[in-house]
């Protein structure tokens, strides 16, 4: 499982990007966030996730927020 930092996330549109520890940007969709309630991420938030190859490049799945 990779770790990274939320680069930006638009809660209204439900997507954004996560910067990995090696500097790669990975697409993040709200449906991949593993939490109850409103699924959103905050800029600068630390997260853990798996990476899958999506239609438009690397995509984060199984996103969990780190304390």
Swiss-Prot record:
**Residue intervals of the CSD domain:** 4-63
The UniProt entry's GO CC annotations, sorted and at most eight, read: cytoplasm
Task: Extract the InterPro entries matched here.
Answer: Cold_shock_CspA, Cold_shock_domain, CSD, CSD_CS, CSP_DNA-bd, NA-bd_OB-fold
Which Gene3D superfamilies does this entry report, sorted A to Z?
Answer: 6.20.370.130, Nucleic acid-binding proteins
Q: Where does the source fall among the domains of life?
A: Bacteria
Q: Which Pfam families match?
A: CSD
Q: Does the keyword Signal apply?
A: no
Q: Please tell me where this protein is predominantly located.
A: cytoplasm
- Compartments where found: Cytoplasm
A GO molecular function assigned to this protein is:
DNA binding
Write out the entry's keywords from A to Z: Activator, Cytoplasm, DNA-binding, Stress response, Transcription, Transcription regulation
| Induction context | In response to low temperature.
Does Hydrolase appear among the keywords?
A: no
- Self-association state and partner proteins as the record states: Homodimer.
Give the protein's recorded name. Major cold shock protein
Where does this protein come from, organism-wise?
A: Streptococcus pyogenes serotype M1
In the record, what lineage is assigned to the organism producing the protein? Bacteria, Bacillati, Bacillota, Bacilli, Lactobacillales
Gene of origin? Answer: cspA
């Amino acid at each position: 499982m990779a770790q990274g930092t939320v680069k930006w996330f638009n809660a209204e549109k439900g997507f954004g990007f996560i910067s990995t520890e090696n500097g790669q940007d990975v697409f993040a969709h709200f449906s991949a966030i593993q939490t109850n309630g409103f699924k959103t991420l905050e800029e600068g938030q630390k997260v853990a996730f798996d990476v899958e190859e999506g239609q438009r490049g690397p995509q984060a799945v199984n996103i969990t927020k780190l304390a």
